[in-house]
Amino acid sequence: MSWIIFYTIIFALLVLDLGVIHKKNEVMSFKQSLLFSLFYFTISCLFGIYIYYNMGADSTREYYTCFLIEKAMSLDNIFVISIIFQFFKIPQKYQHRVLFFGIIGVIAFRAVMIYGGIILINKFSWLLYIFAVILIATGVKTFYVSHKTFDIQNSYLYKSIIKYLNVTPNLEGDKFFVTRNKKLYVTPLFISLILIEAIDLVFAIDSIPAIFAITNDAYIIYTSNIFAILGLRALFFCLAEIVERFSYIKYSLALILIFIGIKIFIHHYIAIPAYISLTVTITLLLLGIFASVIRKNIVDRQ
């Protein structure tokens, strides 16, 4: 029943998104994007209340912790998506179409990765320690790397698409496919969709291990992941400006990853409750936001 409720909510949100709010290829303003994202955030929080009444307080804390971590870790994803759109010169009015169908792929691929990960961890518990090393290494690296980049032209996937598929030289409106001389062609819009799906899989390799350190409950992991990604895609059109304002969040994220990695290593000796993980996550994110605001105010005064 819980899965039916979740998928009903997601289906309703997708219908509302494509069938009502974005029925026409109109450019979303900063304010509209912000309000739409706030709407998604509210739905995500309300779903946490549903989890509280059906699964208990600990599961609720795990849900919110996973949600916040996935939200924070997906920020770099937005920059790479921007690079892809710029490379293919995708107009803003068509970008939402790509993001929407990208969500459909995310819903499917994340399910496979999460369930596959849970099966592997249940069978080989030592994998968690490998995840811990990856998380700590990623956290340390985050202090030294500004944003993840993506060399599209030299990527294996892009070269393979160009080599094996018929590709139109220019966009064909909002179409992913066109037929010419009885041959099927893919458009740059479709290639951008494939690359965005591939990038999401790459980023999931970073974020999902962090979630496994919080809980191995498939329902908590999957629902928090999907709600976080839905809200982030809604915020895409104003996120670049927001991330620029909150530039220190990446350091908060680095500390969160290191904390989670350490938590895995010590869990046999010290059991860290779900409420502490949630408190640490919220505190570090808020510190990153406050530090960013203070820094921006200082810069603006100079």
From Swiss-Prot:
Keywords: Cell membrane, Membrane, Transmembrane, Transmembrane helix. Its main location: membrane. It holds the Pfam family TerC. The chain crosses the membrane at residues 1-21, 33-53, 67-87, 101-121, 124-144, 185-205, 220-240, 253-273, 274-294. The keyword Cell membrane applies. Belongs to the TerC family. It is found in: Cell membrane. GO terms for cellular component: plasma membrane. It comes from Rickettsia bellii (strain RML369-C). It is a multi-pass membrane protein. This is Uncharacterized membrane protein RBE_0082. It comes from the Bacteria.
